[in-house]
């Protein structure tokens, strides 16, 4: 069966494994967008290390979970977000101002909303985690 949205599948797998209390989760297929999204999550300490396994096909990723993640999800379609509209999306998607991040894809790469605000750039919303 053809996968329509590999990022959505990966984030849902992480979400389900986290709810079940698993220590690791296997994601396949691997893509650059998933790797960048996981890097942002790891930078903020919501997941542990992850390892990319090259099987000469689509690839796999093994993610170590820390138990800190409450929810992660994808926003589809990928809405355009200007810098001034970021506050509105933050209020809609995140539970509070203290924690949680929206992940954007911008011309400067894939980053969280705080880094996008610092770099003064908008982009398209990929997803969120808290």
UniProtKB/Swiss-Prot annotation:
Alphabetic keyword roster: Cytoplasm, Nucleus, Ribonucleoprotein, Ribosomal protein
GO biological process: brain development; chordate embryonic development; erythrocyte differentiation; regulation of cell cycle; ribosomal small subunit biogenesis; translation
Predominant localisation class: cytoplasm
Keyword Cytoplasm: yes
Phenotype upon loss of function: Morpholino-injected embryos have a thin yolk sac, bent tail, and show a marked decrease of erythrocyte production.
Family designation: Belongs to the universal ribosomal protein uS8 family.
Gene3D superfamilies for this protein: 3.30.1370.30, 3.30.1490.10
Location in or out of the cell: Cytoplasm; Nucleus, Nucleolus
Highest rank taxon of the organism: Eukaryota
Stated name of the protein: Small ribosomal subunit protein uS8
The species this protein was found in: Danio rerio (Zebrafish)
Keyword Lipoprotein: no
Assembly and oligomerization: Component of the 40S ribosomal subunit. Part of the small subunit (SSU) processome, composed of more than 70 proteins and the RNA chaperone small nucleolar RNA (snoRNA) U3.
GO molecular function annotations of the record: structural constituent of ribosome
Function: Component of the small ribosomal subunit. Part of the small subunit (SSU) processome, first precursor of the small eukaryotic ribosomal subunit. During the assembly of the SSU processome in the nucleolus, many ribosome biogenesis factors, an RNA chaperone and ribosomal proteins associate with the nascent pre-rRNA and work in concert to generate RNA folding, modifications, rearrangements and cleavage as well as targeted degradation of pre-ribosomal RNA by the RNA exosome. Required for erythropoiesis during embryonic development.
Database matches in NCBIfam families: PRK04034.1
GO cellular component terms listed in the entry, alphabetical order: cytosolic small ribosomal subunit; nucleolus; small-subunit processome
């Amino acid at each position: 069966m053809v996968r329509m949205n590999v990022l959505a599948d990966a984030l849902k797998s992480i979400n389900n494994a986290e709810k079940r209390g698993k220590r690791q989760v296997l994601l396949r297929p691997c893509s650059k967008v998933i790797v960048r999204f996981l890097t942002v999550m790891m930078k903020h300490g919501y997941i542990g290390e992850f390892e990319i396994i090259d099987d000469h096909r689509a690839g796999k990723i093994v993610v170590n979970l820390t138990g800190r993640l409450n929810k992660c999800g994808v926003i589809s379609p990928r809405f355009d977000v200007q810098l001034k509209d970021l506050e509105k999306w933050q209020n809609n998607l995140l539970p509070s101002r203290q924690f949680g991040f929206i992940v954007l894809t911008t011309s400067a790469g894939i980053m969280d909303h705080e880094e996008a605000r610092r770099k003064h750039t908008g982009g398209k919303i990929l997803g969120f985690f808290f």
